[in-house]
Amino acid sequence: MNYVGQLAETVFGTVKELYRGLNPATLSGGIDVLVVRQRDGSFRCSPFHVRFGKLGVLRSREKVVDIEINGEPVDLHMKLGDSGEAFFVQELDSDEEDVPPRLCTSPIPWGGLSGFPSDSQIGTASEPEGLVITGRRKRRRRRKPRRREEDAVDSSSEELEAGAESELTLLEKPTPESPSAQEAEEPSSQPKDIHPYSDGECTPQANLSSGDLMSPKSDSELELRSLEPSPLRAESHMQWVWGRLPKVAKAERPEFSLILESMAEAICALPEEPSPSSSPSEAGVDTLSPPVLHPGVRADTFHPAVEAHCEETAVDSPLAAPESKETKTQNSRGAGHPPATKSWSWTTPESHTPSGHPQVSRGKGSLKRNQHLGPSDIYLDDLPSLDSENVALYFPKSEYGMGARRWSEPSNQKLLESPNPEHIAECTLDSVDKIELSLCGGLADNRDISLEKFTQHMVSYEDLTKNPGLLDDPNLVVKINEKHYNWAVAAPMILSLQAFQKNLPESTVDKLEKEKMPRKGGRWWFSWRRRDFPAEEHSSQREKAATRKQQGEKTEVLSSDDDVPDSPVILEVPPLPSSTPGYVPTYKKSLRLSSDQIRCLNLNEGANDVVFSVTTQYQGTCRCKATIYLWNWDDKVVISDIDGTITKSDALGHILPQLGKDWTHQGITSLYHKIHLNGYKFLYCSARAIGMADLTKGYLQWVSEHGCGLPKGPILLSPSSLFSALHREVIEKKPEVFKVACLSDIQQLFLPQRQPFHAAFGNRPNDVFAYRQVGLPESRIFTVNPRGELIQELIKSHKSTYQRLGEVVELLFPPVVRGPSTDLASPEYSNLSYWRKPLPYVDFEALA
């Protein structure tokens, strides 16, 4: 029993250590890179997929990735994203094609870590000229854990870019979280050439060109924001495919789509008012609410209306404090009469009925009411007829769906009137000017969303019908009453108007904004020192900052709710000289290098060790190793799977080798060695995750048989996360999705050679499918089962083994001869054909 206990303890400890190495929080890895030298001397390379674990780099400001090749540092750097992915930064020309916003980024901070002050420097930083700070010691209160989670999830930050205007940022030294601990805040200026924050924390005006490209949100930021209370949170997941950067992919929810469709149908039933033709003083006020469709009338035959002559005004501040109901009523009543080319508001309705318009009597029983739907509902049955004139009058066609529909427009005065004056005030308050949809994003940015940017990404009715899933897009912005909301806040507001004909109370809207709207706040030096400011403070700070830039003045900086200052901090900033905006370069993310950049790496023929490292202040240097292989365009490549092909099974092939058990097929090492001696290159392609790169490479180097090991070659793994790769391979059983994309990309590197792949080894029909997709013939596709039986796909009835295939390796894998050869030019003069005895003549007619 002691032996059994010791064995169980050993197995448990080994599995525990293995899990620690595979934990996504510490999982790092790099996929090998293949560089192919072309016939003209240029180079092509496969993507650089490098990923650092979440705990490998705690602080996102230290995002410069250094590269060493063969032990020597190179003048090439990568940038680290918030989810741990590394990528190159390329500057675009002005005349180059447009780049998707998610691929845009800020330049690499060349200053490195030397540009950041240390902890001692933060506390004793000298005061810059022109900056006067007055204030007393502040008392720091202990933050609650729940408050910390909200700060980590909802806080947003701003990146300081080099330009004509430089901003001064207050730095605060972290202090112990004791009730009596007190520290004095000292100022420090931010170097202009340092970009300490991640891409997801950049404002679009700071890191992009003058074209209205929105700021690309990093992956971890999108993951954190998906943790907010939202019905779509469970549908979000990271998707990282071969040759591309990671992105958030969301699955569509059928039940939610049905709700949206029903809401759209109800919105389609809203009436449209004809253009006024008389003075508004001739009639009273209508109190028409959205009508209700009768079950006998098809809602899809009507379209929501848009008013072509509606007035568009720029939004000063999307987070401005909302006006009270009394203020709204006074403003609407005190407004002057609008011109005839503009639509009438609730307080200035028209009374003239167009000629030929059917009038509905206000007599008893003329209108069908429902006590649950409010006093202003009307059925389509109340209309005398639904001819083309009435349909065009009440339901005109429009280009945009619920985007430009005016909910507050009353119908004709004589069509529906309310005898109760209380309803007038109610409808005046419970009205929405218009609702518009746009994919412009920018709700978390400190700057307001411009009207041009909002209009540029406007969502039309056709866009919504073709892709209802765009409502799940994190960049969706809903404009209601000249205010911007995300869908999580706008959906309850729209539903309340449609179902109850009433607006949500201001307290409810404010609560929704605090819970589900991305907050706008300042970015402090440390990732755990992020502040959240209320909307009122944001608005006042932006107004003061704009005034400060035009003319120098003393600005009062408000602190957050966790710091209670005895006196305000006063900043005296000198006026900045006005400068004309010049050309701002645009940078994009890339995973590949150009031919000139590859030439500067001075790669050796064959394998080149590469180390990607990120240096942090508290954790030291986090390294990730990989290999760059330099091949020629005319090399012949043999593809080999790992799990189930080199190992005896898929699942146990991951576990048993870590326990010291040899779980490889007999004879495969010697077979691969003989094939390699004939001049063939080996490429190992597996659907394992990128975090298992070191584990997989160590296993392939450990495999040995009769003193010879497996040939060296690039190990191409899936760049997705560990659990995504296991789900795709074990649950979905679709590893060919990755392999087809990967092998097709490798095949493009060998152009103009039509087929660089000579043979392939696998263990599943999925592997055979992937190999066929890249043009391999069935005669050179081999599959092996767990019993070690090797099957050639062309002759499936014949079974062999790796040992037997090694005996005839010269026939299936003849030696590769480079350059001109008489054997290849004239096969009849080869050693085999020229010296062999001629075949005997057989008279088939005599045999018949």
UniProtKB/Swiss-Prot annotation:
Database matches in PANTHER family: LIPIN (PTHR12181), PHOSPHATIDATE PHOSPHATASE LPIN3 (PTHR12181:SF62)
Motif placement: Nuclear localization signal: 135-144
Tissue: Significant expression in intestine and other regions of the gastrointestinal tract.
Regulation: Inhibited by N-ethylmaleimide.
Catalysed reactions, as listed in the record: a 1,2-diacyl-sn-glycero-3-phosphate + H2O = a 1,2-diacyl-sn-glycerol + phosphate
Biased composition (Acidic residues): 151-164
Entry remark concerning the domains of this protein: Contains 1 Asp-Xaa-Asp-Xaa-Thr (DXDXT) motif, a catalytic motif known to be essential for phosphatidate phosphatase activity.
Record region (N-LIP): 1-108
Location in the cell: Nucleus
Biased composition (Basic and acidic residues): 536-556
Keywords: Fatty acid metabolism, Hydrolase, Lipid metabolism, Nucleus, Phosphoprotein
Transmembrane residue ranges: none
Modified residues (Phosphoserine): S155, S156, S218, S460
A Pfam short name: Lipin_mid
Organism: Mus musculus (Mouse)
The UniProt record lists the keyword Phosphoprotein: yes
Protein name: Phosphatidate phosphatase LPIN3
Chain's role: Magnesium-dependent phosphatidate phosphatase enzyme which catalyzes the conversion of phosphatidic acid to diacylglycerol during triglyceride, phosphatidylcholine and phosphatidylethanolamine biosynthesis therefore regulates fatty acid metabolism.
A molecular function (GO) term: phosphatidate phosphatase activity
